[in-house]
């Protein structure tokens, strides 16, 4: 069976669409930055995921583009990316800050010249604001002291917010593998297991079934750690009656949806059952609100009202959805100030996190917006039989 992935022609089309937006915005060139931890914007164009070092993509208004990498990644990038213009730029070196005294690297000016961008008083757009470090920004300023440098994250949001059929296929395949891993972990859940042992079960399963990597650090944590909105699994030993939060994710061509559900190792107490059931109801309520044309802020505001009407305002932390794609959580979020309408083929994680002083829980799955609702991109609905208790 053919491997599910993004074809080279689609990557080329992304560069072309970006170049058009660069020109419309009055920019001469766009610089997009990424890292091993958050590669989404740079991989969107290059299909390259850096290791240790950072990377960048430069796209000129004329459609020419280059991948910029650190000194150790030139051959690596040349083998993994479809881009044939790979430039070593010192500002993308690793955090150990090696000097590489024998290396002659290129400057941003050298790279831009290769793209046909000349002159001193140019206008440079920089995207991935939170992934652009001061070394990269200062490198641009040193090369172009007379340039106008502006943030251009709006270009990336415009490009990435609507998913192609190939992107949705990657999300579906990653979710299929994640579902297998979730079932494998539940089959191994019992008192005496550590959280990290369960992570190992999930990792083994996703690689055996075709994932390129974990989509996020696998969540398998119990009891008080379930209060963490984000966390890491530990050496904690799981005990009978513990509520265990699973949030697993496989990665396919970079696309990293997750499936999250709370599982009890044994029988739930009534307190836990009530909160788990409320979270599931809030999750299903959210799913029913999603369709093209609805304002994201309206869903977010009414989501909070749902908690308030149930007397659960103290259990609210955030929600109800965030974008998903090349990273498990990406823009846009659905928040009370998110005044944009939902559009077909926008993809989100319905992320229903409920917290309390002693434990928390999350029901989560990937969906795609349709004209009259949304479609679940996971292979099956979560929580169909209510709160999950694993017999041990």
Could you say what each language-model-derived stretch is?
Residues 1-392:
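Active-site neighborhoods and metal-handling regions in enzymes and metal-associated proteins
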